[in-house]
């Protein structure tokens, strides 16, 4: 009996030790409650379009009065949104818990909730989930949605179809980050426009499927470019500069403006530092690498590649712009002259037709007179 009593006392001594051990091993439980309240701090959105208000009941991330402050915050938020308090608080906590599981920090979640602009919490969660499935990390997702919050209003089915289409183009598995930074409208633009750009690169520019994927990844601005301008830019590199397909892809040539390309290329050409290769791909002088022409700043280009002063290059750019204006004006004059010639030819043809019609009428009149004379002769006989 005495032994049993000692055993009971030992159990009582072990109970507080067990709870202390559990508290040390799971410190995140209390922290998670504080985190949830801190995340709710900036969720109050005005009904006229998304101005975030700081609520006085929330003080800092380190100390939050719970549960009264949290209840007041959620109630204030949901009253502004016209949502039932119990239902809305549960939805907020569920969405925030999901975002935390995806790897978003407190700051990330605050930013995302501040840019949702009328989109429902479920819509926000669905769109973000699609981005995560495409291989994006939390930081790029926040940057893209802050830059283009209209993406949150996309129908989720459209988002999923576009995601599947981009994966077929090879833009999944983390390759979509740069595309979204440079061209976030890839999810909102017509799929036919994307198809037209891809078809142009494959059929007219003769890039391989792998090269097209690399171009879309490294030069996503081609998706916004006029197709005629894009084709001319490729032809300028291939025929005028003598650059082959692998070098065009490797140097990311298509991301640069045609003005910049022509200015630097023609400047080097007139300095005698660049030659268009012959049919065998040979030149009398070694041409500078494309990366040393386009992928450097203007100061570095002039100092290392062209070896001239800034003043000389500025004068050249003005002269080149004047030459192109004169060339365009002469081209327009030639077109106008050719149109005038065509109109004159049409007028001459119309006049010839009128003359022929008059001749036909005269012949008909002569025939009618001859027939009348023959009839008169017959009557006299």
Curated annotation (Swiss-Prot):
One term of GO molecular function: rRNA binding
Predominant subcellular localization, coarse grouping: mitochondrion
Transit peptide segment: 1-42
Record has Transport as a keyword: no
UniProt keyword terms in alphabetical order: Mitochondrion, Repeat, RNA-binding, rRNA processing, Transit peptide
Processing after translation: The mature mitochondrial protein exists in 2 forms differing at the level of their N-terminus, one is starting at residue 43 and the other at residue 48.
Region spans: Dimerization with NSUN4: 310-327
Ranges occupied by MTERF repeats: 142-172, 177-204, 209-239, 245-270, 290-318
Record field: compositional bias (Acidic residues): 340-381
A Pfam family this chain is assigned to: mTERF
InterPro entries assigned: MTERF, MTERF_sf
One GO CC term on file: cytosol
Compartments (UniProt record): Mitochondrion
GO BP annotations, alphabetical order: camera-type eye development; heart development; mitochondrial ribosome assembly; mitochondrial transcription; protein targeting to mitochondrion; regulation of DNA-templated transcription; rRNA processing
Region annotated Disordered, chain positions: 322-381
Record text about domains: The MTERF repeats form a half-donut shaped, right-handed superhelix, where the concave side displays a positively charged path for nucleic acid interaction.
Family: Belongs to the mTERF family.
Primary role: Regulator of mitochondrial ribosome biogenesis and translation. Binds to mitochondrial ribosomal RNAs 16S, 12S and 7S and targets NSUN4 RNA methyltransferase to the mitochondrial large ribosomal subunit (39S).
Subunit structure: Heterodimer with NSUN4; this interaction may be required for NSUN4 recruitment to the mitochondrial large ribosomal subunit.
Protein name per its UniProtKB record: Transcription termination factor 4, mitochondrial
Source species: Homo sapiens
Gene name linked to the record: MTERF4
């Amino acid at each position: 009996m005495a032994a049993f009593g000692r055993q009971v006392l030992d159990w009582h001594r072990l109970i507080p030790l067990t709870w202390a051990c559990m508290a040390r091993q799971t410190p995140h439980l209390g922290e998670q409650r504080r985190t949830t309240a801190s995340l709710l701090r900036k969720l109050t959105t005005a009904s006229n379009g998304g101005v975030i208000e700081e609520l006085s009941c929330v003080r800092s991330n380190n100390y939050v009065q719970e549960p009264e402050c949290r209840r007041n915050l959620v109630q204030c938020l949901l009253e502004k949104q016209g949502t039932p308090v119990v239902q809305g608080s549960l939805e907020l906590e569920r969405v925030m818990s999901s975002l935390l599981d995806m790897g978003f920090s407190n700051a990330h979640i605050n930013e995302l909730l501040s840019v949702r602009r009328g989109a429902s919490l479920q819509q926000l969660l669905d769109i973000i989930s699609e981005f995560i499935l495409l291989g994006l990390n939390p930081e790029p997702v926040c940057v893209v949605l802050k830059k283009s919050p209209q993406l949150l209003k996309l129908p989720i089915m459209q988002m999923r179809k576009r995601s599947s289409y981009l994966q077929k183009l090879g833009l999944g598995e983390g390759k979509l980050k740069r595309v979204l930074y440079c061209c976030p409208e890839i999810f909102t633009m017509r799929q036919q426009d994307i198809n037209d750009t891809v078809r142009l690169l494959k059929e007219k520019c003769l890039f391989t499927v792998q090269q097209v994927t690399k171009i879309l990844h490294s030069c996503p601005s081609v998706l916004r470019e006029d197709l005629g301008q894009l084709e001319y830019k490729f032809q300028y590199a291939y025929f005028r500069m003598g650059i082959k397909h692998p070098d065009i892809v490797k140097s990311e040539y298509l991301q640069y403006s045609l003005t910049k390309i022509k200015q630097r290329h023609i400047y080097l050409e007139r300095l005698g530092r660049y030659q268009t290769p012959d049919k065998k791909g040979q030149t009398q002088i070694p041409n500078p690498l494309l990366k040393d022409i386009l992928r450097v700043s203007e100061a570095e280009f002039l100092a290392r590649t062209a070896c001239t002063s800034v003043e000389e290059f500025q004068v050249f750019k003005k002269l080149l712009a004047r030459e192109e204006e004169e060339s365009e004006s002469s081209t327009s004059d030639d077109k106008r002259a050719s149109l005038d010639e065509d109109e004159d030819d049409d007028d001459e043809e119309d006049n010839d037709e009128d003359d022929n019609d008059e001749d036909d009428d005269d012949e008909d009149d002569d025939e009618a007179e001859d027939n009348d004379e023959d009839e008169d002769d017959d009557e006299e006989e």
